[in-house]
């Protein structure tokens, strides 16, 4: 079974997807983390100056794919954690994700991950592009104000003000929705859940109710 959870940043995708995967004992794939890993590697010297095709042919980053284990990111063998949470990396990931060759590279990896079986994927094009035949497709949304407050908790203190972050989110939304390749859209047969006034537990309960109702 494949469940996809799409939506813009700050809607609770990652936390919800992980909670759902834990509850169902499914594998969990955070595709945003995958794009940020690529972006982090691309920002480092000398990879920043390599032609993109060469960079993707011999990437200095890697991921662990194992049943029942969280997806981990590595750069030259070094485990990446807080390095992926900076605004610089987020901005670079947004720019690189516009490129069709980057998206094709990542989508291939994501489909390979699905071979583990019983997966929850979260991202921006999981239900619309990567897994259009997923068993259940969720699209999370939330107000920009709420999303900015949530994202602030993931950033180092003093990085951005709530107003600055909200502006960044709106800018990213526009870029995601308007990109030529695999834009952020509600997938066909996707179910929209507004998480603005909901806790993660409440969102999780809504998704579980859908699963049980449809006997998936």
UniProtKB/Swiss-Prot annotation:
GO terms for cellular component: cytoplasm. It is found in: Cytoplasm. The keyword Flavoprotein does not apply. GO terms for molecular function: ATP binding; CMP kinase activity; dCMP kinase activity. It catalyses: CMP + ATP = CDP + ADP; dCMP + ATP = dCDP + ADP. It holds the Pfam family Cytidylate_kin. The keyword Flavoprotein does not apply. InterPro entries: Cytidylate_kin, Cytidylate_kinase_dom, P-loop_NTPase. ATP binds at residues 7-15. Keywords: ATP-binding, Cytoplasm, Kinase, Nucleotide-binding, Transferase. Gene3D superfamilies: P-loop containing nucleotide triphosphate hydrolases. Its EC number is 2.7.4.25. GO terms for biological process: pyrimidine nucleotide metabolic process. It is an enzyme of class 2 (transferase). Belongs to the cytidylate kinase family. Type 1 subfamily. HAMAP family: Cytidyl_kinase_type1 (MF_00238). This is Cytidylate kinase. It comes from Chlamydia pneumoniae (Chlamydophila pneumoniae). The gene is cmk.
């Amino acid at each position: 079974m494949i469940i996809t959870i799409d939506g813009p940043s700050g809607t609770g995708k990652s936390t919800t997807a992980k909670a759902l995967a834990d509850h169902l004992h499914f594998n969990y794939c955070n595709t945003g983390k995958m794009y940020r890993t690529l972006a982090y590697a691309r920002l480092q010297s000398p990879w920043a100056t390599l032609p993109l095709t060469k960079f993707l042919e011999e990437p200095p980053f890697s991921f662990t794919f194992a049943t029942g284990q969280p997806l981990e990111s590595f750069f030259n063998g070094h485990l990446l954690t807080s390095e992926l949470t900076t605004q610089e990396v987020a901005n670079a990931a947004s720019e690189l994700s516009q490129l069709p060759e980057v998206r094709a590279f990542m989508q291939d990896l994501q489909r390979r991950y699905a071979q583990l079986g019983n997966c929850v994927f979260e991202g921006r094009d999981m239900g619309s592009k990567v897994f259009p035949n997923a068993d259940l497709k969720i699209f999370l949304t939330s107000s920009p104000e709420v999303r900015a407050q949530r994202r602030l908790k993931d950033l180092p203190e003093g990085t951005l003000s709530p107003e600055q972050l909200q502006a960044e989110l709106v800018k990213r939304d526009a870029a995601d929705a308007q990109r030529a390749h695999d834009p952020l859209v509600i997938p066909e047969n996707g179910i929209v859940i507004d998480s603005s006034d909901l806790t993660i537990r409440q969102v999780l309960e809504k998704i579980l109710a859908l699963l049980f109702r449809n006997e998936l």
